[in-house]
Amino acid sequence: MNLKMKSTMMTMMFLLSALAGCAGGDGAVDLDDSDGGYDYASNVDNHRMLMGDVCDIKDLSGAYDWDGVKDIYENGEYAEKSDGSYRTLMGFADAAGKNHAYDDYYGADGSWNDFVSAAIDGTGPFDGESDTVRDQAVEKGIQNGVMTAYAIHELNAAIIKAEAGNWGPDDAQHAWDEGWAFYHGPDDADADFDGCGPFATAAKRGGNFGTGDATNIATLAAMNDGLAALVAEDMQGVIDARDEVLKNVVIVYSQASVRYASKMTVDLDEANGDYDKHQAEGHAFFRVIEAYVADHTDGCYNMAVHKVFYTGDIDASTCDAFMWTQHNGEGDYMCYNTVTHQVSTDVTTETECDGYSAQLFQERYGAEKINEIYDLKNDGDTDADYEAHVRMYLQPVWDAFGITADDIGTLQ
């Protein structure tokens, strides 16, 4: 073989090697440029393919193949980068400094990884729990918790980039695209993974509550509006779009929290053996929104009647603002709060009205009560109407986000 032929063959081998190295990377994943009605401004194929990991984990978790789940969760499977490494679900879930509220709320970096890894390993709150409970926590925790956190992080990252003047398709628009990639996933024929993300959950909950595709339609519109605002360098438009996405996330996972609370009551009544399973599902679903809604669930405890008046987002001093008065000096007396302009119907006398005080402020009361319902160690109360309780605790949240009864719908 002469030198020229050797040189040619070595060059071909080098090129083939280089192409092989890109086989799993952004440029080599053959996806179209849109998903579910959203047209990407940039290449986020690698990010979209991460949803394939979620799909396979759901299958493995359902079969209680914890080693298989752990391998994909930690090492990745579909989202191979151009350098041969993989984007992984654990890599995001365990990362510090992400642009979402979960880690600050739970007081730990990588708070979603703490939850998911404990469920995979059967440790922490999942120590001694059944495979069924662990499966629900893993599936719901990854599909909904990790992927929603990832999406929110990217939308906020887009805003941060835009605030720094980096509005373009390589910067803020790229981050915004990533948000949809993680929320929706690819719907291509050869990579049909869009049934494994939060978007798919929203469709199911819409079916459960008679609201159809309302939340997904609103979320898609907000995503398209946000991208258009980035192109136009309209900061308020981007922020409004992000807030609309978050509002619809709250609707979806409020519906989920209500639904599985209702199932728990039925399970106890029928003694059908599904209580633990549905409790684990509700536990994971509420965790998706807890960090964003808990501050709207404060309350004031009344020492005289031993009840909590549910107020929404307040500070302790608001609990001192109850007074025994009449409306415009006429009619029956009532216990009126001069800050929230609410009337406590739990009390009927001035002495009882005086039972409220700042010292008895109940921070995040509603969120704590929901967590008590979904506590995996709680074996249930056959006399409790869990759906009614969860609805009551979430009502101030819905008021704060401008969420109506029609938005939530009626559980079918």
Please tell me what each predicted stretch does.
Residues 1-28:
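Secretory targeting signatures
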Residues 23-34, 327-330:
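Intrinsic-disorder/low-complexity linker and hinge segments
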Residues 300-364:
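Extracellular/cell-surface secretome signature
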Residues 28-304, 362-412:
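Mature extracytoplasmic or organellar-lumen-exposed domains after removal of signal/transit peptides
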